[in-house]
Amino acid sequence: MLIRAFIPAHITAFFVPVFHEEPLKAGSLGAGVNLSKGTNVFASIETGTLERHIHVAFNGEPVKREEAEITYYVAEKLVPKDFLGEVEVWQYFDFPNGYGFGNSAGGALGTALALSYAFGGTWLRAAQLAHEAEVKHKGGLGDVIGQLAGGIEVRIKPGGPGIGVTDNLFFEDYKVLVVPLGRLSTREVLDGDVVKAIEVEGRKALEELLKEPKPERMMVLARNFAEKTGLLPGELSEIARELDKVLKNPSSMIMLGKGLFALVRDEEAEKAKQLLSDMNLPYDIAEIYTERPKVGRWVG
């Protein structure tokens, strides 16, 4: 049996981490956007061996347990202890790991949905397990519930699926421009001194967005958040200022990754692509993904 799940890449615009000793009560407030590109997870289940084996691969390359703690945590919970056979989980990412696109959550949620589909379970239980794995292993706090929401989402009550509450912004004709330049460790940022500034500025941004719930306002608030928290490094700030010259809405920093994102329409996208090409910078453009994640039997 081969099961496939697709989870959209998720970019956080601004956030407030909310920690709690119970994983499902931990989460984040904030806002973000889901992309039409993301993580594809294939789960192959074959019976007939004398033992229970679980294997994980990223982009076609097998990985050790310590390199895929979150995925193995999910798989160990969902593959029955008395199952005799081979379970292979293959994760393919459209964006690099560690760049702020919610890959760890995408892998966790995709694995949870695929294995729940195969062995029995529900959407909510699968999503809660993925969130639990993310929180326990410090992969992230709000990506799973954000990916479930689709579109341009706003996290208005913290917590995992079934506890946290999300809303969505209306939008028209926007695509997402991304400029992925490098890695940034969520674990290091959330353990650092910058957390207090994030909490203060993130709550301000959320309050302002709820007063004027529009994508354009979200981008202004996201840029302010990135600058006032000190998260936006000089290199990204310079690129953002150049993009400002050709975009109607400000670009902002991908939270948390060394990169930028912007909401663009077709005419602006062409100008931005030309600018970034002239600057010899990588970029990509994706649609906004408005559905929930997908899962089902794969027939190729």
Curated annotation (Swiss-Prot):
> Which is one Pfam family of this protein?
GHMP_kinases_N
Q: Name the InterPro entries on file.
A: GHMP_kinase_N_dom (IPR006204), GHMP_kinase_PoK-type (IPR053616), PoK (IPR012043), Ribosomal_Su5_D2-typ_SF (IPR020568)
How does activity change as temperature rises?
Answer: Optimum temperature is 80 degrees Celsius.
Q: What is the effect of changing S28A?
A: Does not affect kinetics toward ATP but decreases affinity for pantoate
- Kindly report, in one word, the top-level EC class recorded for this enzyme: transferase
- Variant or mutagenesis effect after changing E134A: Loss of activity
Task: Give the record's free-text account of how this protein's activity is regulated.
Answer: Moderately stimulated in the presence of potassium cations. Inhibited by increasing concentrations of pantoate. Activity is not affected by CoA/acetyl-CoA.
Instruction: State any single GO MF term.
Output: kinase activity
EC number, as in UniProt: 2.7.1.169
| GO biological process, alphabetically ordered | coenzyme A biosynthetic process
Named in its record, the pathway it takes part in is: Cofactor biosynthesis; coenzyme A biosynthesis
Phenotype of the disrupted gene, per the record? Only viable in the presence of CoA or 4'-phosphopantothenate.
How is activity modulated by pH? Optimum pH is 7.5.
Q: Catalysed reaction per UniProt? A: (R)-pantoate + ATP = (R)-4-phosphopantoate + ADP + H(+)
Instruction: Note whether Transferase occurs among the keywords.
Output: yes
Arranged from A to Z, the UniProt key words for this protein are: ATP-binding, Coenzyme A biosynthesis, Kinase, Nucleotide-binding, Transferase
Q: How does it assemble?
A: Homodimer.
Q: Which PANTHER family match?
A: PANTOATE KINASE, PANTOATE KINASE-RELATED
Q: Which family does it belong to?
A: Belongs to the GHMP kinase family. PoK subfamily.
Q: Please describe what this protein does.
A: Phosphorylates (R)-pantoate to form (R)-4-phosphopantoate in the CoA biosynthesis pathway. Displays broad nucleotide specificity and utilizes ATP, GTP, UTP, and CTP with comparable catalytic efficiencies.
This chain belongs to the protein called Pantoate kinase
Organism for this UniProt entry: Thermococcus kodakarensis (strain ATCC BAA-918 / JCM 12380 / KOD1)
